[in-house]
Amino acid sequence: MNWITKILKAGQNIKERIKDRASREELKSSKWMPSCCGSAPVLKETIFNEEQLNTCPNDNCQFHYPFPPRSRFDHFYGKNNWEEIDTPRIPDDPLSWPNDVYKKKLAAARKLTNQRCSVLVALGERDGVKVTSFAINSAFIGGAISIESAEAILKACDVAIQNQTPLIAWSEGGGQIMFESGLSLQGMTRTVLGVNEV
């Protein structure tokens, strides 16, 4: 067997292994998932429950899986003990990317997360104290901060100042979104100034 035949055979083996893998839909609907700490597959219900709070039960691992903002607010404030604050809407795609690349990414992220941007703002009560909070959703384009996300953070700061409440932030993912270039970097400065006001 010459070297070309070996390479072709190896490529064929790789293709067959890829075909044998489960699809994304099958993985989502399955009760099982790959373990984060390299052991055998684990039941999803052992990780995604009220006791574990999306954290690996293995004491040597304690890996934290993403925790969507609405679930986080339900856990922190108590179910139905908080209200979602409307945040300013900014026009999509301020730099007019060709072929609507950015608009398509935004549409897919909105459909996946049921959020307008990566930041969700809430006002609720915890142990008799009113608290304003915001959470970043890593499922929304990796939790990247767009102009609209920065405006949402500023809205959280304004609500905290107006209601004289503490402000709690849960960051998951982040960084400025590349599709908005320098415009999103301006948002970083504004959010720092807003948080300093609180």
PLM-predicted stretches and their roles:
Residues M1-V198:
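Terminal-region recognition feature
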